[in-house]
């Protein structure tokens, strides 16, 4: 998977954390059997920036931990007829994730686990949203959260 990571925070994340998130999302992509030509972006921001995005796109005037903007919503697809070999070469853009590093630190402290664990949790949570998972209904929540746990545990990021 082609993963572009941008760090727009005032205190840049350590390379070790950036690499951990990159490796974790690559692991998650393999767990979901995504094709290698899948692409997405992840941008780390501070609370003021994620608050702006949350207000602009969700009409919620407060900072949040993670925002996911899927490139395509389920059912948006218009069928295109093309040669299967050509279709396999066209990149599949999942969309864009934004994670507030301020919220990562706050929530890790509140929940009593490491910053790496919270960072990984939010990255996988947003990644699953980009792949069509949600937690609006109890059955969907159970399915998404089970997969989230399996990915985090399989990667070795336990509580």
Swiss-Prot record:
Residues that span the membrane, as ranges: none
Keyword Transcription: no
PROSITE patterns per the UniProt record, alphabetical: UPF0054
Protein name from the UniProt record: Endoribonuclease YbeY
Organism annotation: Limosilactobacillus reuteri (strain DSM 20016) (Lactobacillus reuteri)
GO cellular-component term (any): cytoplasm
Keywords for this protein: Cytoplasm, Endonuclease, Hydrolase, Metal-binding, Nuclease, Ribosome biogenesis, rRNA processing, Zinc
A Pfam family annotated for this UniProt entry: YbeY
EC identifiers of the protein: 3.1.-.-
Binding site for Zn(2+): 125, 129, 135
Family: Belongs to the endoribonuclease YbeY family.
Record function comment: Single strand-specific metallo-endoribonuclease involved in late-stage 70S ribosome quality control and in maturation of the 3' terminus of the 16S rRNA.
InterPro entries documented for this protein: MetalPrtase_cat_dom_sf_prd (IPR023091), YbeY (IPR002036), YbeY_CS (IPR020549)
NCBIfam families to which the protein is assigned, alphabetical: rRNA maturation RNase YbeY
Cofactor note: Binds 1 zinc ion.
